[in-house]
Amino acid sequence: HGTSPEDVAGRSYLEWLTSLEAGYAIISSLCRRVVIGGFSTGAGLALHLAARVQDAAGVFAVSAPMRLNDLGARFAPALDAWNRLMDKLSRSAAKKEFVENHPENPHINYFRNPIAGVRELERLMDALDPLLPDINIPTLVIQSDSDPVVNPKGSRQIFKKVGARDKEYILFNIDRHGILLGEGSERVHKRIGTFVERLGRAR
């Protein structure tokens, strides 16, 4: 968000992590207790950071994309390989760099997604998977049971693998991916708020 599909197409998940780490360093220097959290790709990034930073108060992950429902996402690795081959053969006209998107929140989401960006998301989640047992801080995993983008089986997998003893999995009966906005979102906000307040009181 905040740049362009073309910009996302040229980025790696390692750059996303570097940006997150810089933000965490700044906030940690200003606050005694920091709770890491994120939605969708941001949830994956938050969990990745939580596995490596043990001084955070806790982490929450909303709709983390461990498993994607979107059929187009399943073809991202093959399309990414095809695009790289076409680059080597100087056949840029044969490349398929973007797929059309019908966002739930058009005011913040792109109308086309870069194949390379989807592939980087998959690389992020692949890198996260073996790190999940290293998360030892309080963890809250939240998911919609009818998410059209993220398969709830993936969030359950995350919850089971997280190493923290203090962990909770909450499944909301909402039929969309973007559960932080719209009808029912106040229930999600309340649950996250309760989690953060509890961690703020802990010493």
Language model features with spans:
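Short alpha-helix in the alpha/beta-hydrolase fold that links the catalytic acid
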Residues: 137, 151-160, 171
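Active-site nucleophile elbow and catalytic-triad environment of alpha/beta-hydrolase enzymes
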Residues: 114-131, 137
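Gly/Ala-rich beta-loop-alpha elbow adjacent to hydrolase catalytic centers
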Residues: 38-42, 46
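Catalytic nucleophile-loop/oxyanion-hole region of alpha/beta-hydrolase
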Residues: 3-30, 35
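Active-site nucleophile loop of the alpha/beta-hydrolase fold
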Residues: 60-71
